[in-house]
Amino acid sequence: MNQNRGASHGTEKQEVFEKFIMINRIRSNIQTNYTFCDIIRKPTAKQIAFLEELIMSPAIEDKEEYRFYYRILKAEEAMLSGQWDSISSFIFGEAENGAIVLKIGQRIIPKPIQYQIAISLYTDKGDMYDEIVNIVKNGREHRPNDWDKEMPECVRKENTFTVYRAGKESIDKAVDSLSWTLWRDVAEWFAERHEHYGQEKQHLYKATISADDVIAFTNSRREFEIIQYGGVRDIEELPRIGVSAEYKELFSATSYDFHKDQENRTTALDLFAKWYRQNNAMGET
């Protein structure tokens, strides 16, 4: 009996040791690929299967580290086989993973694909990572021809847009701020939100930007966001008037139900169009 227990204990120790060695090897390979991007160490099928087993194990409660490594290895595997569309599926909504993958793949992922990935990550905490921000800043030349397909019809064909921004930066620094919006209510909402969570006093800026200088337009979160770098002009500071009651109602209606969310998106577009027409008629946009 004691011999069996000893053998079992020895097997467990060996398994723990082998797990430790494998995790360290995976971590080391990722770090090497991140630091030296000229030659990428391809993840092995054994490493991926090892992580899959850990992620599926009911005996392990905290699996986030293993998921973190797994996403990177699968993205590396996709980039090394030229499966560009697959890369995003492994890092969607994971800005930290995405920043690492973009750095590792900077020499092999085509620039337009890097642009697409960086823009999708930027709007979801990606502004915290230089690897993402630097691609966004230099992304204008990789902007697709249909970059404005999600833009409201009432402004889509304009050559120049009026944009707004809430920020703590001084007016002379605002030109290099990446995130602006077509809708003043969005900027007013961000100003209130930032101050509510203890950030510095927010300024509300208004500017114009040529369509040719826009890096991207995104509306995945109903923020009507214009992404730019150094393209805005005629910047002025506006008095804060607060968020409109209609926008507050719209924001409070945010839903994770797909059909309800689609309904809210339509409502947002309608409200924006109404606001745009009213202010355009008054010459205030």
Name each model feature, range by range.
Residues 2-162, 169-178, 184-285:
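Conserved NAD+-utilizing ADP-ribose enzyme module
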